[in-house]
Amino acid sequence: MKNIETILKLAEEKIVLVHNLKDLQEYKVEFLGRNGIVTSELKKLGSLINGQKRKEFGLKINTLKDKIHDIIKAKAQNLEAEELHLKLAADKIDLTIPARRYKQGSIHPITQCMDELIQVFSQFGFTIENGPNIENDFYNFTALNFEYDHPARQMHDTFYLKGHENDKPLLLRTHTSTVQIRAMKNGKPPFRFIAPGRTYRSDSDMTHTPMFHQIEGLVIDKNINMGHLKYVIITFIRSFFENSNIELRFRPSFFPFTEPSAEVDIRMNKNDKWLEVLGCGMVHPNVLKNIDINRSEYQGFAFGLGVERFAMLKYNIKDLRRFFEGDIRWLKHYNFESFDIPNLAGGLTK
């Protein structure tokens, strides 16, 4: 495990020598990006068994991220000031010309929410897996234990495409569970990963859109049980919303690919209404059988959530359709800046 002081010193030494914003952005990615040095250290939290050590290490990494973020932001301000000074010195200034407003873009709320969700799961040691948006019937339905007459297979629920792959109909994936099947077929257990991405269903109203974003998670290992699932979900929810007082309840439900299955409801305060936020359960033995994993040796749990749903709850957005209208004024209202690095490690220690 890299020494935290060494990482901070390295960041300071590199950033102080930067002479332009392009190089500064590259160092930002190198240290604070999804695959950056600090993020890689943060992922090691999941391997720490001792709760106290995990708490201490999480706080240290959190402090390190804040310091590097402040160094980068201060350097960016200095570079911008230097560039302006050089430009003013080189140009002939007409003081009668009205000043132009400085326009700055902002991060879309879905992107911001996705980054925050991934950040939380990285603290559990989850890796990220990706897969194609166009799938065949096997990966989207059959391998996940959907019966051939299941309603989700019907054309009014699923976008089918022309053509076949290995004699299987092609379609736009209806969930990112397809990534789980591909990842397990191409690897060997144990597994612990999330699959973020776009999904597609033939539905459009105030609470549904034909394209939406999901994050689905999977853990496969020996001696996995429902207690592990509940711990991950409860800790994740309270960390993401940065509220240790959130109440959760697990309601029995049904999903073809999990057994037992549950839907998770939350409420921020005791007098609030319960809100459904995600589905989860223990991986169905038939799913493991379909990809040749020994069901008597390995067990696992899976969960899936809608990113738009979590963004609406956290940022108090009432209408799902606003995410996709492209209204610059609406996007500017939330004003997530490119230097707003998700910083939620402290949520695990509340």
From Swiss-Prot:
Coiled coil: none annotated. Binds 2 magnesium ions per tetramer. Pfam families: Phe_tRNA-synt_N, tRNA-synt_2d. GO terms for cellular component: cytoplasm. It catalyses: tRNA(Phe) + L-phenylalanine + ATP = L-phenylalanyl-tRNA(Phe) + AMP + diphosphate + H(+). PROSITE patterns: AA_TRNA_LIGASE_II. The keyword Kinase does not apply. Its cofactor is Mg(2+). It is found in: Cytoplasm. It is an enzyme of class 6 (ligase). It comes from the Bacteria. The keyword Chloroplast does not apply. Keywords: Aminoacyl-tRNA synthetase, ATP-binding, Cytoplasm, Ligase, Magnesium, Metal-binding, Nucleotide-binding, Protein biosynthesis. Its main location: cytoplasm. Its EC number is 6.1.1.20. GO terms for biological process: phenylalanyl-tRNA aminoacylation. One of its GO terms (molecular function) is ATP binding. Mg(2+) binds at E259. Tetramer of two alpha and two beta subunits. Belongs to the class-II aminoacyl-tRNA synthetase family. Phe-tRNA synthetase alpha subunit type 1 subfamily. NCBIfam families: pheS (TIGR00468). This is Phenylalanine--tRNA ligase alpha subunit. The gene is pheS.
